[in-house]
Amino acid sequence: MVSSFVLDYMHLVCLGHVKKVISLWIKGPLRCRLSAVTISIISNHLKSVRDHLPRNFSRKPRSLMEYSQWKATEFRQFLLYTGPVVLQGRLSAQMYNNFMLLSIAMTILLSPVLCCKYCGYAGKLLKCYVTNFAKLYGTEHLVYNTHCLIHLADDARKYGALDNISCFPFENYLGTLKRLVRRPQNPLQQVVRRLAEKPILGEDGRQSKAQIPHSCGPTLPDFPAHMQFRQYRHEGTVISCCVGDNCFDVEGRVAVIRNIIQLLSGAMYTVCQFYEQQDCFCRYPIDSSCLGIRTMTQLSDHLYGVPVTSLTKKLVVLPLRNGHVVFPQLHDH
């Protein structure tokens, strides 16, 4: 019966444990507390990658000192994407490796594909994480949230990827409801009227639509007659020439979009460059390239035409000192 009550990772992991860990770095015991200089460096790095995140991420990174005001999506973003980059070389090796145990485990449990293949492995990572957490931060911090981490893989085994059973959809829809209310009087009636006027089923947001025409190129010689656009919405996904929304996985290769073209036939193509060299981002606790997390260097000089239908996965790309690190985008908000 107890196992039938699922754990919500939004509250357990994001608003619970990750928030707790950051608080220990800032004002915890001396053995795990970071210096003010290190916190400032991490915070500045976080703010510097704001423009590199996809626009459908509703919140951009803020200073680590503002963690008490972060929303659940910000803690999730830190755990899965920005944290592994900005913490590298700033935490001790033991603390960073322990953070990566949690980050990699959650990446697996939040991906529908990886969850099916590596659910058992993610459970082992979480048990290892909790054991090492006690050694690094002290057993006095092994609270209920920390203990429950070891049971997340059991829920994923039963119900699939953890986003299937999280509170995030309800939290996101709450914002939609709030936008339907214009004044404090009779809020329920206002919501009912707005819903009756225009059913918010999301069809409009998923319609394919080319936006922001231009004529600046680059183009390809085998596309003689065409229109050029800076942005295209395809089945709810924003495809753009701008940093943050211009990197996609194409048959295992990372494509950087330079232009969007509509042929006379109506077919939509992107003009892309591909990264030519890639390596894994980290080797602990697993070769990260197995999860699609890679470092990329050296863009090709050649341009290629790629149909928008071939852009299978949107990527989160963050700058490194030499090159970029690529993460599969697991969420659209």
Question: Predicted regions span which residues?
Answer:
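Terminal interaction-prone segments of large eukaryotic proteins
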Residues: 1-4, 8-15, 19, 23-333
